[in-house]
Amino acid sequence: MTTASFESYGELDGLGRCTTAFANIGKDLMPAEKRGSIGEVKPTGWQTAKYDNVDGKYLYNRCHLIGYQLTGENANAKNLITGTRYLNVDGMLPFENMVADYIKETGNHVLYRVTPVFSGDNLVASGVHMEAESVEDNGDGILFNVYCFNAQPGIAIDYATGDSHQDDSIVADASKSTTAADANVQTYILNTNTKKFHKESCNSAK
């Protein structure tokens, strides 16, 4: 592993789908300004669908493989997939926040890779595979290897096209997903009030 920062985004495949985003994230890659517009990017399977039972109404987000807070990528089509609100906020964001907090607190680097998983020729990913390891301390601070489902409670999704409809029988099964708290429980504890991860020795974790 190296302590030199870098970022790399795989070429889109023959169907225009994202492949893999890979980076060694340090403070120097993290953005100093607010995120710009990404609305011009239409990832594969993109649909504008609104439901009253979805937080924020919109089913789909333009979901960064590597979050903006980590590498400052805006409208990079190689880094944006069609992801549900649930994937973006409840699935990926806690892990992204964990990494961002660690880098800001330590100044260390985190080797980070996110790969969308598509079934066959589907245009919408079934989920994303997230991997991370802190470099300078050989994974003592950050170490996870998780899969986050691209699903939405109460909504049925046709992953081949991105079409969707309301189906209240669909419930997210947390037992099938690895949570951020589970991924590094020996090093970080989730403060349920602030939604932030803290080291076990930190007063904020108690």
Predicted regions and their residues:
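Mature, structured domains enriched in cysteine- and short glycine motifs
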Residues: 171-206
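Domain-level detector of nuclease and nuclease-like folds
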Residues: 2-176
